[in-house]
UniProtKB/Swiss-Prot annotation:
Extent of the signal sequence: none
SUPFAM superfamilies: Nucleic acid-binding proteins, Translation proteins SH3-like domain
Primary gene name: RPL2
Domain of life: Eukaryota
Protein name, per record: Large ribosomal subunit protein uL2m
Length: 502
């Protein structure tokens, strides 16, 4: 497997983690010879792979926190929520060439500014759908960085409808920043309109209030009270009724014309500021998985509508029906063959589809995997995520025909029964030569966070019970820890424990 690393990991899928240096929460050393090491960023790995979609491997990257490699996958399906493609035949599965390009991606997003009060922003709606050209409204382009939006305008003239993977970082950053900035502009425009209306209401209220000679000492600030009455907040209902009576008859018609204030932190309900999820994720790379290969996720909880991706829509029910048919056929006689032939039978297993799905890197249920197949990233419970066989070069083997429970031989040699609805990834975990590597110098061990191991006889008497003395001697006592506790297997038990047994 060639390791194609171009640039750093995506910032959206990285997070920083602290180091404990072998200490627990109370500060005591629980694991010796740990500490130091180079700085690392944790990668967010999609171990569940719950999205029923097809993806293309963009590149294979190095992960300093695990022994295997990781793959950056760009998902073709599943980016648009609520839309799924139907593939009835194998010929319809042929994808366009522009989708199979390893450096392109398409993101869905919708901007709507019909609710804004600005005359330039009203009625402007720019939609970015699957395969449509990138377009942004004026309010989003105004004041933007030329390095990001200038390329989009040039591509619009040229006719390019996708953008490169290197701009996904910019898209994630700018999409969130512009969402907050657009919200801020909308709030400012709404506040300016509300302040203008409030001043008019306050002026009319002052004119009517002077006639009624209301008690001014029991009133709240007029602007705040007028703002509360306009927005319809019930927290100011305990205020003086004279101000409300003076305000309501004059400007009662204006209350219905003013727009209601949206809750704090929420925008319009048409999805104007909704940011779609990223079209790429990190997964554990399989051996012989290279950039440009296609991988498939088959989700049992959300069966795909396509018969091409899921040969058995309900494999668990089909296997139970198959076992029932075998039990009934054991007592069948020759004369009843015609009667048995008329019984309903499940559809024949399409082995050509299973061979197509059983490619390296595909995540499919154990019920759809043939006997003798090498798998990794196995789930213990359906939908839990990969738990078994995740280290570099490890794999498990299917050693029994799929039934309600599948028998799997783990890398340790233990045979375990796992629910057939659990999913596993075809192939072996990448980087199988991880165990054969050799450290060229002591610094490589320190880079990995391992501190040197020092023998007790090489220390001083103040540091260890075995320290001191002339030459390599430990004073004739058995091996003990730095605190004087026995460390050999025969000396760990208390004195006289075996004699107490009757």
């Amino acid at each position: 497997m060639r390791q194609s690393i171009k640039g750093r990991a995506l910032r959206h899928f990285t997070l920083s983690t602290g180091k404990s240096a072998g200490r627990n929460s109370s500060g005591r050393i629980t694991v010796f010879h740990r500490g130091g090491g180079s700085k690392r960023l944790q990668r967010k790995i999609d171990l569940k792979r719950s999205t029923s979609s097809i993806g293309i491997v963009e590149r294979i990257e190095y992960d300093p926190n695990r022994s295997s490699r990781i793959a950056l996958v760009r998902w073709i399906e599943g980016v648009l929520p609520g839309r799924q493609r139907k593939f009835k035949t194998i010929e319809e599965f042929a994808l366009p060439r522009k989708i199979l390009e390893s450096t392109t991606a398409t993101i869905f997003c919708l901007f709507s500014f019909s609710s804004l009060s600005s005359p330039l922003a009203q009625g402007e709606t720019a939609s970015l759908s699957f395969g449509s050209s990138l377009g942004f409204p004026r309010i989003a382009v105004a004041g933007a960085k030329p390095a990001f939006f200038a390329e989009r305008m040039r591509e619009k003239k040229i006719g390019k409808k996708t953008f490169s993977l290197c701009e996904i970082r910019k898209w994630r950053t700018h999409c969130v920043l512009w969402a907050h900035r657009i919200k801020r502009k909308a709030a400012l425009s709404w506040q300016s309109l509300r302040q203008q209306k409030t001043l008019e209401l306050v002026g009319a209220a002052e004119h009517n209030e002077s006639k009624l000679k209301a008690d001014q000492g029991s009133l709240l600030p007029r602007q705040v009270l007028a703002y509360a009455l306009c927005s319809g907040r019930p927290s100011y209902l305990h205020a003086s009724r004279s101000f409300y009576k003076a305000l309501l008859p004059v400007e009662a018609s204006r209350f219905g014309s003013l727009p209601a204030k949206p809750p704090i932190g929420e925008g319009p309900k048409d999805g104007a500021y909704k940011v779609d999820r990223a079209p790429v994720t990190y997964i554990l790379a399989s051996h012989q998985l290279e950039a440009g290969n296609m991988v498939i996720n088959c989700d049992c909880s959300k069966p795909s509508k396509s018969g091409f991706l899921r040969p058995a829509q309900n494999a668990h029910t089909y296997l139970r029906f198959q076992e029932l048919g075998r039990t009934v056929n054991k007592g069948r006689v020759e004369g009843g063959s015609q009667l048995a032939a008329s019984w309903p039978r499940p559809p024949a297993y399409r082995h050509e589809i299973l061979d197509l799905n059983s490619k390296v890197g595909n995540s499919i249920p154990l019920a759809d995997i043939r006997m003798g197949t090498w798998v990794h990233d196995i789930e213990c419970h359906p939908g839990q995520g990969a738990k078994l066989a995740r280290a570099a070069g490890t794999y498990a083997k299917i050693i029994k025909e799929p039934a309600s429970q599948c028998l799997v031989r783990l890398p340790s040699g233990v045979e375990k029964l796992i629910d057939s609805r659990c999913r596993a990834t075809i192939g072996i975990v990448s980087n199988p030569n991880h165990g054969a590597r050799k450290l060229r110098k002591a610094g490589q061990s320190r880079w990995s966070g391992r501190r040197p191991i020092v023998r007790g006889v090489a220390m001083n008497p103040v540091d260890h019970p075995h320290g001191g003395g002339e030459g390599r001697t430990k004073g004739g006592r058995p091996s003990v820890s730095p605190w004087g506790k026995p460390t050999k297997a025969g000396f760990r038990a208390g004195v006289g424990v075996g004699k107490r047994r009757i």
